[in-house]
Structures are given as structure tokens and as C-alpha cells.
């Protein structure tokens, strides 16, 4: 498990990070602590990071995305901001947004600008290994349509999506966790 800077138990501030930094962090950890083939497993933003790493690391042998959120800074955040929010973000460098899970969170100009340098749905995305996308039907943070768009965009011969009725963004019910465990084991066994 990896907590990106500004996430989980890491010591850095979220507002100091961006997609490029987090992808570089993940790549450095994978390079330092693994040998041989790797299966990338990423949830939400981690799904986007996994898409990026799948193009950078030749050792990737599979990808399991859970509510994967590719290009969310552009297609989810920026696209949903009204003119006043965009102006605040650009002028002040930060925009505070409410969260359904926690205290309000900051969206920085840095994350929006950097995200534009790492978009994966606007160029070919070859994945010549097993890909499994797990998605909840009740996810309001990453809508099922995002998973379908990613499914259709990935170029590969073994790309599948499972939509779980009633599952939300956290995808953490006992049934969801069992499905996740089974899916990772399946992808890891495919050669």
C-alpha cells in the first residue's frame, strides 16, 4: 500500500501535490521494492496513476481499477466549476469545496494545470495485459459512465468491467472486498 504525499498517513500537505508528483512517487516505490512483473491496483485517483504507470513501466502485467478516475481534474473538477469558481481558483490559486466524507477540501490551480499534462483519455492507451475495472452503480464521485469511457478507450484484448449494483465510491462492503480480492488474484494468475 502507498499513501501519496498529502494523502492518508503521509506527512506532506495535499495542496503541495499534483498528479505528476504522485505518479512519480508511485513509480519510484514500485521500482525500488519490486522485481519482475507487477499488477497495478488503483482506486479512484490511483486508477489514473495506474493508467499513467502502465505506459511507463514495461513490467506491468495487469491492472485492476476500482472506481478509476482518469482525467478527473479536467473532466470532473474543471468541467463542473462555474465561472466564479474558475476565477477564484485562478486568482487565488485554491478553491475550497465541500466533501461528503470529511471537512472541505482544497482544489489547487497546480493540480488542475499539472493534471492537463497527464491526461490519458485523449491519446491512445494501449494495455496489452489483463485489465479489470470494478465500479459501483451508486458511486456519485466517479460515475459509472467514467468506467465505461475508460473501458472503451483502453486498447487491449482482455479488458473487462464489473458493475456492482448498490456499491458506492468506497467499494468497501464485504462483498466488494471479496470481489476485489478475487479479481486481483485472477489477474495475477493470467500469464
Predicted regions mapped to residue ranges:
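Alpha/beta-hydrolase active-site loop
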Residues: 16-33
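Catalytic histidine neighborhood in serine/cysteine hydrolases
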Residues: 154-170
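Gly/Ala-rich beta-loop-alpha elbow adjacent to hydrolase catalytic centers
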Residues: 42-46, 50
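Conserved alpha/beta-hydrolase
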Residues: 1-11
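Short beta-strand/loop motif that positions the catalytic acidic residue
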Residues: 126-127, 133-135, 139
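Hydrolase active-site cap/lid region
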Residues: 56-107
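Catalytic histidine-centered segment of alpha/beta-hydrolase-like enzymes
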Residues: 167-180
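Conserved alpha/beta-hydrolase "acid-adjacent" motif
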Residues: 140-146, 172
Amino acid at each position: 500500500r502507498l499513501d501519496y504525499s498529502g494523502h492518508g498517513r503521509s506527512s506532506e500537505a495535499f495542496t503541495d501535490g499534483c498528479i505528476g508528483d504522485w505518479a512519480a512517487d508511485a513509480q519510484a516505490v514500485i521500482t525500488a521494492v519490486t522485481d519482475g512483473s507487477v499488477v497495478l491496483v488503483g482506486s479512484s485517483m490511483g486508477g489514473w496513476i495506474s493508467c499513467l504507470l502502465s505506459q511507463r513501466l514495461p513490467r506491468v502485467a495487469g491492472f485492476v481499477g476500482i472506481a478509476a478516475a482518469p482525467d478527473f481534474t479536467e473532466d470532473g473538477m474543471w468541467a463542473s466549476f462555474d465561472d466564479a469558481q474558475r476565477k477564484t481558483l485562478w486568482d487565488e490559486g485554491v478553491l475550497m469545496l465541500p466533501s461528503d466524507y470529511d471537512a472541505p477540501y482544497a482544489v489547487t490551480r497546480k493540480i488542475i494545470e499539472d493534471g492537463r499534462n497527464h491526461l490519458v483519455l485523449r491519446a491512445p492507451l494501449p494495455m496489452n495485459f489483463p485489465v479489470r475495472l470494478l465500479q459501483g452503480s451508486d458511486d456519485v464521485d466517479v460515475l459509472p459512465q467514467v468506467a465505461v469511457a475508460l473501458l472503451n478507450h483502453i486498447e487491449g484484448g482482455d479488458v473487462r468491467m464489473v458493475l456492482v449494483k448498490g456499491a458506492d465510491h468506497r467499494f468497501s462492503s464485504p462483498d466488494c472486498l471479496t470481489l476485489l480480492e478475487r479479481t486481483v488474484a485472477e489477474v495475477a494468475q493470467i500469464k
